[in-house]
């Protein structure tokens, strides 16, 4: 997927996407990603999984915004339409509260969930 947007037709068709993907790194697992980010930022990132359910270590958007304001490196973990693998929730430091809406149904397309979460965390 990344190669499509970095070389050939994809890169020509959408050069700004190519530019955005220049900072992308493909990692094998969460531990490798945490090691890389720890080396890069000099501090272990706080890992925050996302999903459609609450967990015992769930935190709200306001709490996470507070951590971000402290300048802590934070690694947000998003899954596919099927969610994250169970072990990721166990390994993560926190799980972000699910995106709530009207009623009990809260399953969103991943793109939509990411957009809503980022807006709630970094919008002014």
PLM region spans:
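Long, charge-patterned amphipathic alpha-helical coiled-coil/hairpin "stalk" segments used as oligomerization
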Residues: 53-87, 98
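RNA substrate-binding interface of SAM-dependent RNA methyltransferases
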Residues: 1-52, 115-123
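N-terminal hydrophobic or amphipathic segments with adjacent small-residue motifs
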Residues: 45, 73-77, 107
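Residue-level detector of alpha-helix boundaries and kinks
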Residues: 15-22, 77, 98, 102
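Structured adenosyl-cofactor binding patch, chiefly the S-adenosyl-L-methionine
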Residues: 82-124
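A short acidic, often aromatic-flanked loop/helix-cap motif at beta-alpha or helix-coil junctions
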Residues: 31-35, 55-56, 102-105
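Short, well-ordered alpha-helix to beta-strand connector turns
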Residues: 44, 71-72, 92-93
